Amino acid sequence: MVSQEIISDFEGAFGIKLPKLYIKLITKHNAPGIIQSYFDYYDSYRNEDEYSSFGFEGFETESNKHEPPENIFSQYLYDDDIYGYEHVYSFGRSGCGDFVCFDYRDNPKGSEPKICLVIHDEYDEETGKHLLFPVAENFEAFLDMLYDFDERYPNGYE
C-alpha cells in the first residue's frame, strides 16, 4: 500500500496532480503486476503500428524498503534538459526499458494527463529528444486498452 502522504509528496515534488484512478489503484497496490500488460500504439517515426509490454513503477514504502520496485521518484525524462520533456513523468516501463508516462504538456495543472510512450534509446532527428508517441487520452483509457498478449495472439505475433 502507498499512503496518501507519499502520493502528496510526489505530487508536491513535481508540481502535478495525479489522475484519481491512478491514485486509487496505487494506494491499494503498489507497483501492481498485471496480466493484461500489452498495449498498441502508432510509431509515427516509422509509420507503423507497434505494441509494447508494460509494468508499473512503484513507490518506496516501509513494507518494501529492502526490495523497492523501480522507484517512481526517479524521473529521468523530467530531469533531462537535453533529451527529456518538461511535464512528462514516467509511471511505468516497457519490457524494452522505454518509459510509459503521464503527459501533462497540454495542461500542466490538470489531473487527467494523456499517456505516452518515450523510447529510451531512439531520438528525434529534428529536436534531438527521445522519441515520444501518444498512447491514450487519459489513464482510464490506457487501462481499458491493455490486453493479454497470449489471448490476442494465441499463435504468437504474425
Regions found by a protein language model. Give the residues of each.
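Short, surface-exposed beta-strand/loop "edge" segments at domain boundaries and coil↔beta transitions
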Residues: G97-V100, E122-H130
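A surface-exposed partner-binding patch
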Residues: M1-D98, P154-E158
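Short beta-strand micro-motifs enriched in acidic
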Residues: S94, F102-N107
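Intrinsically disordered, low-complexity regulatory segments enriched in Ser/Thr/Pro
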Residues: P108-E126
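Beta-strand-rich cores of mature extracytoplasmic or soluble domains
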Residues: Y89, D98-F102, P113, V118-I119
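Acidic, proline/glycine-rich low-complexity IDRs
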Residues: G128-E158
